[in-house]
Regions:
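Single transmembrane alpha-helix segments in multi-pass membrane proteins
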Residues: 23-86, 110-116, 262-272, 305, ...
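Transmembrane alpha-helical segments in multi-pass inner-membrane proteins
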Residues: 221, 227-228, 238-304
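Cytosolic-side transmembrane-helix boundaries in multi-pass membrane proteins
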Residues: 1-23, 27, 201, 207-215, ...
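Helix-loop-helix "hairpin" substructures at the membrane interface of multi-pass membrane proteins
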Residues: 89, 93-94, 103-108, 112, ...
Length: 322
């Protein structure tokens, strides 16, 4: 069972940190406070938030999915190739990207549940496979998706809407909010969600209580793959041209966001609300640091310390509860 008081406290703290972080960067740098910077950050946030929502489920079971970053790129490349070389309708290509993600998630689940591979090793293997596969299929050439002005570029409007006065609004943020509410409901109020938490809390007890642990393990990785596929579409809409061989490291930002948002690194605890807020904390941190003079290396160092702090807080909190 999830303790509501603890959950809301965690989310509130992370939400305050997010607001404070944004205000600090905006105060120090006038450029960071520009509306165009905000829109750019919102664009990037779509695929990061989607990956974080998906990976939260394996994390809550005590597992991990390292394939979501390179997988997202691979699925976007697959859909882009279908449109570019085979004139496949955009909607069909998007569906293929999503199903590709679900398929890799299924493979991860089978490797872990049926074959008994550790989640870290199994998903590391599929991470390498998807990264290489994207390069092989495309010949290492970048694959452009249709632009918003092209007839088959309608999918861009899912993530951004332009008003009559040319003001652009981050419509994708609305989809993130709706998906967050939906998946939080799934986690907290469905059998799938309750069993996911139960497996992460005590796998042996879950087995003894009659839960088909292998089945639900496969399911959580399919959910992770599903959201990586959705993230692939968001990535294609925002970035427009997908470059093979990229994506490595994005999974760490998504996982880091989930942990910062309160998902326990050892499983059994977490919310989708907190996960998404945590993903935005990592995003604001990574986007804001360059504006105050920190280079890419320093960004990695600071982000690493933030994650260490989040994991330490989780460990201390679990000891206090015990």
């Amino acid at each position: 069972m999830v303790k509501k008081k603890s959950i809301f406290t965690q989310e509130l703290i992370v939400g305050i940190v997010l607001i404070a972080l944004y205000l600090v960067f905006r105060t120090i740098s006038a450029d960071f406070g520009k509306y165009t910077t905000f829109l750019s950050m919102m664009d990037i946030s779509y695929y990061y938030a989607l990956m974080a929502i998906g990976v939260a489920f394996p994390l809550i079971t005590g597992g991990v999915d390292l394939s979501i970053g390179t997988g997202m790129i691979c699925y976007a490349l697959a859909g882009g190739c279908l449109i570019r070389f085979y004139n496949v309708p955009t909607g069909v290509a998007m569906l293929v990207s999503i199903l590709f993600g679900v398929g890799i998630g299924l493979a991860n689940g089978v490797l872990i549940s049926v074959m008994g591979l550790p989640p870290f090793l199994a998903t590391l293997c599929t991470c390498m496979i998807t990264r290489g596969l994207g390069s092989v299929v495309t010949g290492s050439f970048a694959i452009p998706w249709p632009t918003a002005k092209q007839p088959n570029g309608w999918f861009h409007s899912i993530f951004k809407i332009t008003l009559a006065d040319k003001t652009k609004l981050p419509l994708g943020l609305l989809w993130i909010i709706l998906l967050t509410l939906l998946m939080q409901f799934v986690l907290a109020h469905t059998r799938f969600g309750r069993y996911t938490i139960a497996i992460g809390s005590n796998k042996e007890a879950a087995i003894l209580s009659g839960i088909n642990v292998k089945f639900y393990h496969v399911m959580v990785y399919m959910v992770s793959g599903l959201f990586a596929g959705l993230a692939a579409i968001a990535y294609a809409a925002v970035i427009k041209t997908v470059q093979p061989g990229t994506g490595a490291g994005m999974e760490l930002d998504a996982i880091g966001g989930a942990i910062v948002g309160g998902v326990s690194a050892s499983g059994g605890y977490g919310t989708i609300y907190g996960t998404v807020i945590g993903a935005y904390v990592i995003l604001v941190l990574k986007q804001g640091l360059p504006y105050i003079g920190f280079n890419a290396n320093m960004q990695q160092i600071i982000t690493g310390f933030v994650l260490i702090g989040a994991v330490t807080i989780d460990i201390v909190k679990r000891k206090v509860i015990k």
